[in-house]
């Protein structure tokens, strides 16, 4: 005679000391709390928040073990957005790789592209040969991108806490920046505009006046956002003292970005390890000593103002000049004056290389189909993205394709802090803690 199996959550055996795990998912919070109150001694409740939950910043899964409404254990489940970008880079030439990396952290594509291109240029040994106009445009686009990314962080964080007005304000301002990106690169996201050795094309006519209009518009709009949230009683109650992580915790976990600077440490790669000429720009590294979600909010708001200062300096420094390295053996074969798409595909350019120079046609064909050859070696480069240190470890075997490219994405590293921030707190406060980290799952899973 066989004994029929009991229900999956039938309770533990007190004689053997085993615990019963009650897994609750997709139910109302009242039912979750009621189940916790009715749980017998020795029972645990594990709640799956995500990966489809609207308050987990994308396809992030939080596995929360709770007692009542208190989190006793928190773990992250990732990998739902894995796309194999790093592996795909090994099957594309060095220039084509830009179109892949720009899609990782999709809220800060210019940082992905710049970090990749800085690594390629360092392997080639041409970092000092990059035209000044290229570096100025790169810095300008990255700082505009920093503002747009922080706006999304504040907008989505506000939405998750019930501040719908903050979401409307944030996305309204972001649209203004994305319209500038679309004017310059042709796309709102996934630009592939920054290339090894330079840029895909020069700034179009009307881009600089449009950026100046943006510089005049955004300060007032940011002031409206600050007036809405800075002294808002409910906002402060939901963020002050929430998601606490001190300097020792950040150093132990390798945390960077606004989370690290909220402990009072002024660590910013733009100052610590300048790149693209950042040492020539005047700006402040914003810090706070709250170590909580509210401090990280204040840092992001103030960093947007510093980014506006840098963009204004970039506009003043823009001088006519080339936007691609002069070495024709390394430069992507494009006549940027004739090729409006930056790829040398204009009829006038094609007619010239095909009708006047057979050698030029052969060079064009070989460089486009095979790509540039990068000397064997390995290098690590890093930039300060909106979320922290975005690093790239590149390995070249001397061929036309990368042997290995690995990204150190700050969202991936910073998610290690979820347990330290959430355990011992309330379930509702986990939303504030994760929002203050601002993870982008495209960068986490890659």
UniProtKB/Swiss-Prot annotation:
Catalytic reaction(s) noted: a quinone + NADH + 5 H(+)(in) = a quinol + NAD(+) + 4 H(+)(out)
Domain of life of the source: Bacteria
Top-level EC class as recorded in UniProt: translocase
Keyword Transport annotated: yes
GO cellular component labels: plasma membrane
Membrane topology: Peripheral membrane protein
Keywords: Cell membrane, Membrane, NAD, Quinone, Translocase, Transport
Keyword Repeat: no
Location of this chain's protein in the cell: Cell membrane
EC number per UniProt: 7.1.1.-
Single GO molecular function: NAD binding
Signal peptide: none
Residues spanning the membrane: none
Family annotation (PANTHER family): NADH DEHYDROGENASE [UBIQUINONE] IRON-SULFUR PROTEIN 2, MITOCHONDRIAL (PTHR11993:SF10), NADH-UBIQUINONE OXIDOREDUCTASE 49 KDA SUBUNIT (PTHR11993)
Function: NDH-1 shuttles electrons from NADH, via FMN and iron-sulfur (Fe-S) centers, to quinones in the respiratory chain. The immediate electron acceptor for the enzyme in this species is believed to be a menaquinone. Couples the redox reaction to proton translocation (for every two electrons transferred, four hydrogen ions are translocated across the cytoplasmic membrane), and thus conserves the redox energy in a proton gradient.
Similarity-based family: Belongs to the complex I 49 kDa subunit family.
Subunit record text: NDH-1 is composed of 14 different subunits. Subunits NuoB, C, D, E, F, and G constitute the peripheral sector of the complex.
NCBIfam families per the UniProt record, alphabetical: NuoD (TIGR01962), PRK06075.1 (NF004739)
Protein name as catalogued: NADH-quinone oxidoreductase subunit D
Protein source organism: Mycobacterium sp. (strain KMS)
Organism ancestry: Bacteria, Bacillati, Actinomycetota, Actinomycetes, Mycobacteriales
């Amino acid at each position: 005679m066989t004994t029929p199996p009991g229900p999956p959550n039938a309770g533990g055996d007190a004689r053997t000391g085993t615990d019963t795990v009650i897994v609750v998912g997709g139910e109302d919070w009242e039912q979750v709390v009621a189940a916790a109150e009715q749980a017998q001694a020795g029972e645990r409740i594990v709640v799956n928040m995500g990966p489809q939950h609207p308050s987990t910043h994308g396809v992030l899964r939080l596995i929360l073990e709770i007692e009542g409404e208190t989190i006793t254990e928190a773990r992250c489940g990732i990998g739902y957005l894995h796309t194999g970008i790093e592996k795909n880079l090994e099957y594309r030439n060095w220039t084509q790789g830009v179109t892949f990396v720009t899609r990782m952290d999709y809220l800060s594509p210019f940082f992905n592209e710049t970090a990749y291109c800085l690594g390629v240029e360092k392997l080639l040994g041409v970092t000092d040969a990059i035209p000044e106009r290229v570096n100025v445009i790169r810095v300008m686009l990255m700082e505009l991108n920093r503002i747009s990314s922080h706006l999304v962080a504040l907008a989505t964080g506000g939405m998750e806490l019930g501040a719908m007005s903050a979401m409307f304000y944030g996305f309204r301002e972001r649209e203004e920046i994305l319209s500038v990106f679309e004017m310059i690169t042709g796309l709102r996201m996934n630009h592939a505009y920054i290339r090894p050795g330079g840029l895909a094309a020069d700034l179009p006519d009307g881009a600089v006046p449009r950026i100046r209009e943006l510089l005049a518009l955004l300060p007032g709009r940011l002031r409206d956002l600050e007036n809405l949230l800075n002294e808002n009683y409910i906002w402060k109650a939901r963020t002050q003292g929430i998601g606490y992580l001190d300097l020792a915790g950040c150093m132990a976990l390798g945390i960077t970005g606004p989370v690290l600077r909220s402990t009072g440490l002024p660590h910013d790669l733009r100052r610590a390890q300048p790149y693209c000429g950042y040492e020539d720009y005047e700006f402040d590294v914003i810090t706070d000593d709250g170590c909580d979600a509210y401090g990280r909010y204040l840092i992001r708001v103030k960093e947007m103002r510093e980014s506006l200062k840098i963009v204004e300096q970039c506009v003043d420094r823009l001088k006519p000049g080339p936007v691609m390295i002069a070495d024709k053996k390394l430069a992507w074969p494009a006549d940027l004056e004739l090729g409006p798409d930056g790829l040398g595909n204009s009829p006038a350019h094609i007619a010239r290389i095909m009708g006047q120079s057979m050698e030029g046609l052969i060079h064009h064909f070989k460089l486009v189909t095979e790509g540039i050859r990068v000397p064997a070696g390995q290098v690590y480069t890093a930039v300060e993205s909106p979320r922290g240190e975005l690093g790239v470890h590149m390995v070249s075997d001397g061929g036309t394709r990368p042997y290995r490219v690995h990204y150190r994405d700050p969202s991936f590293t910073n998610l290690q802090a979820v347990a330290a921030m959430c355990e011992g707190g309330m379930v509702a406060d986990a939303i504030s803690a994760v929002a203050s980290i601002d993870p982008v799952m495209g960068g986490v899973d890659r």
